[in-house]
UniProtKB/Swiss-Prot annotation:
GO terms for molecular function: 3'-tRNA processing endoribonuclease activity; metal ion binding. Its cofactor is Zn(2+). This is Ribonuclease Z. Belongs to the RNase Z family. It catalyses: Endonucleolytic cleavage of RNA, removing extra 3' nucleotides from tRNA precursor, generating 3' termini of tRNAs. A 3'-hydroxy group is left at the tRNA terminus and a 5'-phosphoryl group is left at the trailer molecule. Binds 2 Zn(2+) ions. SUPFAM superfamilies: Metallo-hydrolase/oxidoreductase (SSF56281). Its EC number is 3.1.26.11. Zn(2+) 1 binds at residues 61, 63, 153, 176. The active site is at 65 (proton acceptor). Homodimer. It comes from Mycolicibacterium paratuberculosis (strain ATCC BAA-968 / K-10).
């Protein structure tokens, strides 16, 4: 069984009810944070997970709304890990991830220096193990395996999706993308597909070109549902709602998905959980 928790279902626009894009995946006693949008650790704490308990951080791409709280994750994990010789945090993402992590740590160098000067048991900066990938296996530990494949969020490039597998259960996390062959292949036969969705029918009517532009490189509800159908997944989990999902409108979004996908559809607020079982 794999458990998926939608930590942040929001967008780049601040929302008092939704944290920035982030998803928690629990499998085989391991805990993976996929993207780290604003407010992610507060939502994780509400779900019973602290930064020190993360097995790895997985980044789909380097847009600010998906990595905005990277510094908080790095520093909070560092100061809340009390075991000697802490294991470096594995950070897996597309090319550019190492530069982003290094720049983030450099921006926080004063804070890091203050804490090292103050605490005798902190004698080194936060330990990280950054790995950049665009395709193939990236994790194989205690029965949990993860592989990545390219997605299409151009001009943001490269971008990747993740497939997590454990004891026959499988979950694919698409990140931001339009329909593409890489995601179709990655999601083939998966138990669940976690996919960003936007209401292009609404966004296209907003009289600001900059906002209309987001239609170019995101999937609509119907497009995400069509991807789920092509890939033959069991459950479509929609997240990163643009515009924000309003209470009472859930059935509108479900109806749009149902035009293309006959399977189970999950959507909801931050901390919504979905259990994904192995096929019986």
């Amino acid at each position: 069984m794999i458990e998926v928790t939608l930590l942040g279902t929001g967008s780049p626009i601040p929302d008092p009810n939704r944290a920035g894009p982030s998803t928690l995946v629990r499998a085989g006693g391991q805990v993976f944070l996929v993207d780290c949008g604003r407010g992610v650790l507060q939502r994780a704490a509400a779900g019973g997970v602290g930064a020190a308990g993360l097995s790895a951080l997985l980044l789909t791409h380097l847009h600010s709304d998906h990595v905005g709280d990277l510094g908080d994750v790095l520093i909070t994990r560092w100061i809340s890990t009390f075991t000697p010789d802490p294991v470096p945090l594995p950070i897996i993402g597309p090319p550019g991830t190492a530069e982003l992590v290094a720049a983030t740590l450099n921006a926080l160098r004063h804070d890091i220096g203050y804490r090292i000067a103050h605490h005798a048991d902190l004698n080194a900066p936060p330990a990280v193990d950054v790995r950049e990938h665009t395709d193939g296996p990236v994790w194989d530990r205690d029965g949990v395996s993860i592989r990545v494949a390219p997605t299409d969020h151009r001009p943001v490039a490269p971008t990747i999706g993740f497939r997590v597998e454990y004891q026959g259960a499988s979950v694919v996390l698409a990140g931001d993308t339009v329909p593409c062959a890489g995601l179709d292949e990655l999601a083939a036969g998966a138990g669940a597909l976690v996919h960003t969705v936007i209401r292009k029918d609404i966004v296209a009517t907003i009289p600001q070109q900059r906002l209309q532009d987001i239609c170019d490189y995101h999937s609509s509800v119907e497009e995400a549902a069509a991807t789920a159908a092509r890939a033959g997944v069991g459950t479509l989990v929609m997240t990163h709602y643009v515009p924000a999902l309003v209470a009472g409108q859930e059935e509108q979004w479900r109806a749009l998905a149902a035009r293309e996908f006959a399977g189970r559809v999950e959507l909801g607020d931050d901390l919504h959980r979905v259990q994904v079982d192995a096929p019986s």
